[in-house]
């Protein structure tokens, strides 16, 4: 990579439509878990969240934090250990079970009667509830309003054609004075079809700008050796804070 391509000042790719017809099915996501193709999972948690977590929480306790497409994110334990309640949604039952096993947490499971085949897994301590279903089937009316969202790997995984529906779902879950931390990726989408999908700043404005103040907290070079196989030569990760207008 030449020096200009490693710069954090690389302009975002102007064509936001290039990936609009890309689709991954729920079955394909489940297969990724079964086949161990989960390089997106961060065993040590997300370092940008770790860096900004105390600023994000502002010393509060008892908050309700939502993890869309949660997988087995270790960050759920971070919030629970700080006295917050975690609600997650994940299509892979395997991912949910691995979370509880790897975090040494006992849990219960029960069916969600209004959603055929869906289940909810709850930690025995009661402060982590993970719903195994599609994000669009998530029983929103049952859980009440949430204070925070940590979206790392959700918006960038949702099929581009479903983003507006996804954003509206997220916003419908939030109560007053909400905060949302959102991570997205910037790269040349003509070279890699996704996922993770390319989400430029303009798309975040389109999806959330009417309801939210949007502030980019940090931008980092996220390019690793494995990303060369994607055909790209740079990858930036951006952390946004969305707050109620």
Curated annotation (Swiss-Prot):
<keyword id="KW-0489">Methyltransferase</keyword>
<comment type="similarity">
    <text>Belongs to the class I-like SAM-binding methyltransferase superfamily. TPMT family.</text>
</comment>
<dbReference type="GO" id="GO:0008119">
    <property type="term" value="F:thiopurine S-methyltransferase activity"/>
</dbReference>
<keyword id="KW-0007">Acetylation</keyword>
<feature type="binding site">
    <location>
        <begin position="29"/>
        <end position="40"/>
    </location>
    <ligand>
        <name>S-adenosyl-L-methionine</name>
    </ligand>
</feature>
<feature type="modified residue" description="N6-acetyllysine">
    <location>
        <position position="58"/>
    </location>
</feature>
<dbReference type="InterPro" id="IPR029063">
    <property type="entry name" value="SAM-dependent_MTases_sf"/>
</dbReference>
<keyword id="KW-0963">Cytoplasm</keyword>
<keyword id="KW-0808">Transferase</keyword>
<comment type="subunit">
    <text>Monomer.</text>
</comment>
<dbReference type="InterPro" id="IPR025835">
    <property type="entry name" value="Thiopurine_S-MeTrfase"/>
</dbReference>
<feature type="modified residue" description="Phosphoserine">
    <location>
        <position position="14"/>
    </location>
</feature>
<dbReference type="GO" id="GO:0005737">
    <property type="term" value="C:cytoplasm"/>
</dbReference>
<feature type="binding site">
    <location>
        <position position="69"/>
    </location>
    <ligand>
        <name>S-adenosyl-L-methionine</name>
    </ligand>
</feature>
<keyword id="KW-0949">S-adenosyl-L-methionine</keyword>
<feature type="binding site">
    <location>
        <position position="152"/>
    </location>
    <ligand>
        <name>S-adenosyl-L-methionine</name>
    </ligand>
</feature>
<keyword id="KW-0597">Phosphoprotein</keyword>
<dbReference type="InterPro" id="IPR008854">
    <property type="entry name" value="TPMT"/>
</dbReference>
<feature type="binding site">
    <location>
        <position position="90"/>
    </location>
    <ligand>
        <name>S-adenosyl-L-methionine</name>
    </ligand>
</feature>
<dbReference type="GO" id="GO:0032259">
    <property type="term" value="P:methylation"/>
</dbReference>
<feature type="binding site">
    <location>
        <position position="40"/>
    </location>
    <ligand>
        <name>substrate</name>
    </ligand>
</feature>
<dbReference type="Pfam" id="PF05724">
    <property type="entry name" value="TPMT"/>
</dbReference>
<protein>
    <recommendedName>
        <fullName>Thiopurine S-methyltransferase</fullName>
        <ecNumber>2.1.1.67</ecNumber>
    </recommendedName>
</protein>
<feature type="binding site">
    <location>
        <begin position="134"/>
        <end position="135"/>
    </location>
    <ligand>
        <name>S-adenosyl-L-methionine</name>
    </ligand>
</feature>
């Amino acid at each position: 990579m030449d020096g200009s391509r490693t710069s954090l000042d690389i302009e975002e790719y102007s064509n936001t439509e290039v990936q609009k017809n890309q689709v991954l099915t729920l079955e394909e996501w489940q297969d990724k878990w079964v086949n161990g193709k989960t390089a997106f999972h961060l065993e040590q948690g997300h370092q940008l969240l770790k860096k900004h977590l105390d600023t994000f929480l502002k010393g509060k306790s008892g908050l309700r934090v939502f993890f869309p497409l949660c997988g087995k994110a270790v960050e759920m334990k971070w919030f629970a250990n700080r006295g917050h309640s975690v609600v997650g949604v994940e299509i892979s039952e395997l991912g949910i079970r691995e979370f509880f096993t790897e975090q040494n947490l006992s849990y219960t499971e029960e069916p969600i009667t209004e959603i055929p085949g869906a289940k909810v897994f709850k930690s025995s301590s009661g402060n982590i509830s993970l719903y195994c279903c599609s994000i669009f089937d998530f029983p929103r009316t049952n859980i009440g309003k949430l204070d925070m969202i940590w979206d790392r790997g959700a918006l960038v995984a949702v099929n581009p054609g479903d983003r507006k529906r996804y954003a509206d779902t997220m916003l419908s879950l939030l109560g007053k004075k909400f905060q949302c931390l959102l991570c997205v990726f910037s790269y040349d989408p003509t070279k890699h079809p996704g996922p993770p999908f390319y989400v430029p700043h303009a798309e975040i404005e389109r999806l959330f700008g009417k309801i939210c103040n949007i502030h980019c907290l940090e931008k980092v070079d996220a390019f690793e050796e494995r990303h060369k196989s994607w055909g790209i030569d740079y990858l930036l990760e951006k952390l946004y804070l969305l707050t109620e207008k």
